[in-house]
């Protein structure tokens, strides 16, 4: 058991890095427990009327801060995968498709963590709480794309798997603003969904249950302080004699260390394992967190924040880069060697079908994702829309090509262009592409993985590179995904498309990168324990998609939220010692 007794010298009891699903849950629950909480978010804050008018509003849609673009959509391309992720106060919730499924059983039974706990039972109450907080309801609206997906399911012989999506949307009366309907009047006013399909461009109406409408809103009401446009570059634990290891200059103070168990006034303790004793630099006396102004070239406005505990929730790419920087830079050297391993893409493929200009039905009068099917036991297919304001996204797609390699797939694309110049012309000069396009999102629970490897550059720079798992590589082609796109194209008279990176470089796209700092039984098998506490350190947690140890096979936001709720349930109220019983998961 650990009890922190340091007085003074801290800016916060807990500092949360990131304001996405894991970060917002952490901010609220820690604030409710009586802690002084700070949140650092690399992106900007958006009011409902500040979202981009379309995806062509580059400055407000795309995230390239050094070029003056501070939007909600980030696209990062590696040699093995292209990753779509979110940015801003509220994280990925600002531009996600608000689809909130509980995963199928294979996720809970994955060998990476199945021996630790009966996760389906352990997480059940936390899924229920996450659903309540995110306002999950079943979408009851049908549209032409739903009918097409239903017919595809019938044609594949899986019509019984067709399901309307559970979504985080306030439907209410379209366009009507009412007092908070979710939190007994403690939340913000809400406006009924108008089925404009703009969920992934940014909801301008106040109907989408983004984190700034629930967890983060309530966290700020409980006193959490959110600092936008701050990028964290370092985490340094205080040593036993003042100043942070490798940093210095921050105020220290006396304190007691310990191993295992959960913390007292400073938060959860470490989980034992590699180097988790009470020695110097284990986090038992707190941390310095250094941040700079996001996107700055010269005037970086470096700030040092001092906290008793830190929750890293910067999203899988941000968290893995930050922790690798700290591990290799020497400030957090005891982080498990498993850091960067078991990175998952949710085994995804993202395709598109654009219907003819004279197609009679409106494909955008819906929420972003309205229904789904399972063509087999481990594959999940959803149809998606950007609404009428996503035309710039057509540059990410080209003609559909089949399986191949980095050499043969570009050749196949050239062959498709030569054989079907009419399709190419329609695609290159498509009018109202977004209005006429069905995005096909395919996800799987299959066990495949890659790694994120740190690469060092000049002047202390660092970036991440991917490396496929040699035994179970991430798929670059999913046959049933192409089959679904081809069926939809034939059924509508449209043009089937695949992502540009997949066709040109054999690099698939995912909107749900996961892992890299996964839950494991010990430091030899994971980076964090069942409570998402970093092995080897006190009061240091990872609460985002980085901790997820397996492909979820569905949209993962609800699972990230539930796991963060689970982790926060183990943190005792401020000033109280931990409960040993609360520290043990349900045995598998």
Locate the predicted segments by residue.
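N-terminal glycine-rich phosphate/pyrophosphate-binding loop and immediately adjacent elements
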Residues: 1-111, 115-121, 291, 314, ...
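Patatin-like phospholipase A catalytic core
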Residues: 143-193, 367-368, 377-447, 456, ...
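Short hydrophobic beta-strand that contains or immediately precedes a catalytic carboxylate
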Residues: 39-40, 226-227, 542-543
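Glycine-rich loop(s) and the adjacent beta-strand/alpha-helix scaffold that form part
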Residues: 32, 43-53, 205, 213, ...
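FAD cofactor-binding and catalytic pocket of flavoenzymes
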Residues: 71, 77, 92, 96, ...
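Conserved redox-cofactor binding core of oxidoreductases
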Residues: 118-232, 504-509
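A glycine-rich dinucleotide-binding beta-alpha-beta segment and adjacent secondary-structure elements
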Residues: 70, 196-199, 233, 438-441, ...
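Intrinsically disordered, low-complexity terminal tails and inter-domain linkers enriched
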Residues: 240-282
């Amino acid at each position: 058991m650990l009890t922190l007794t340091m007085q003074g010298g801290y800016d916060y009891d807990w500092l949360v890095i990131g304001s996405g699903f894991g970060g917002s849950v952490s901010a609220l629950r820690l604030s409710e427990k009586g802690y002084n909480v700070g949140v650092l978010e690399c992106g900007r804050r958006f009011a409902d009327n500040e979202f981009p008018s379309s995806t062509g509003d580059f400055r407000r849609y795309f995230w390239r801060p050094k070029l003056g673009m501070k939007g909600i959509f980030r696209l990062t391309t590696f040699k093995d995968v292209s990753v779509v992720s979110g940015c801003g106060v509220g994280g990925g919730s600002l531009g996600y498709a608000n689809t909130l499924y509980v995963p199928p059983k294979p996720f809970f039974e994955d060998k990476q963590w199945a021996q630790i706990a009966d996760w389906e039972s352990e997480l059940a109450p936390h899924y229920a709480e996450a659903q309540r907080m995110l306002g999950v309801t079943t979408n009851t609206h049908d549209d032409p794309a739903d009918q097409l997906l239903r017919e595809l399911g019938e044609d594949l012989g899986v019509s019984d798997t067709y399901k309307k999506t559970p979504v985080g949307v306030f439907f209410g009366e379209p366009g009507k603003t009412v007092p908070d309907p979710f939190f007994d009047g403690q939340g913000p006013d809400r406006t009924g969904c108008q089925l404009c399909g703009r969920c992934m461009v940014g909801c301008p109406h106040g109907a989408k249950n983004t984190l700034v409408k629930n967890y983060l809103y309530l966290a700020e009401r409980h006193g959490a302080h959110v600092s936008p446009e701050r990028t964290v570059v370092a985490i340094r634990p205080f040593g036993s004699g003042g100043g942070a290891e490798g940093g210095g200059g921050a105020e220290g103070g006396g304190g007691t260390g310990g191993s295992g168990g959960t913390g007292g006034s400073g938060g959860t303790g470490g989980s034992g394992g590699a180097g988790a004793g009470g020695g110097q630099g284990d986090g038992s006396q707190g941390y310095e967190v250094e941040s700079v102004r996001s996107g700055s070239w010269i005037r970086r406005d470096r700030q040092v924040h001092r906290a008793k505990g830190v929750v890293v929730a910067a999203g899988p790419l941000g968290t893995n880069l930050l922790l690798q920087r700290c591990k290799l830079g020497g400030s957090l050297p005891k982080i498990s060697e498993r850091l960067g391993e078991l990175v998952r893409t949710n085994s995804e493929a993202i395709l598109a079908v654009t219907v003819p200009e004279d197609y009679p039905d409106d494909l955008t009068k819906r929420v972003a994702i309205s229904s789904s099917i399972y063509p087999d036991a481990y594959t999940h297919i959803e149809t998606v829309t950007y609404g009428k304001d996503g035309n710039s996204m057509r540059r990410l797609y080209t003609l559909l090509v089949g399986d191949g390699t980095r050499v043969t797939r570009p050749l196949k694309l050239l062959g498709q262009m030569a054989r079907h110049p009419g399709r190419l012309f329609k695609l290159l000069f498509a009018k109202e592409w977004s209005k006429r396009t069905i995005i096909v999102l395919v996800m799987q629970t299959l066990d495949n993985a890659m790694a994120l490897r740190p690469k060092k550059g000049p002047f202390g720079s660092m970036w991440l590179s991917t490396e496929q798992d040699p035994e179970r590589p991430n798929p670059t082609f999913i046959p049933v995904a192409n089959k679904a796109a081809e069926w939809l194209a034939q059924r509508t008279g449209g043009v089937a498309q695949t992502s540009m990176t997949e066709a040109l470089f054999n690099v698939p796209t995912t909107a749900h990168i996961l892992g890299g700092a996964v839950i494991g039984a010990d430091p030899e098998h994971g980076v964090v324990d069942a409570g998402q506490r970093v092995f080897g350190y006190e009061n240091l947690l990872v609460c985002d998609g980085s901790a997820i140890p397996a492909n979820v096979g569905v949209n993962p936001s609800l699972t990230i939220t539930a796991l963060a709720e689970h982790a926060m349930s183990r943190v005792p109220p401020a000033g109280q010692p931990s409960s040993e019983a609360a520290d043990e998961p349900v045995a598998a």
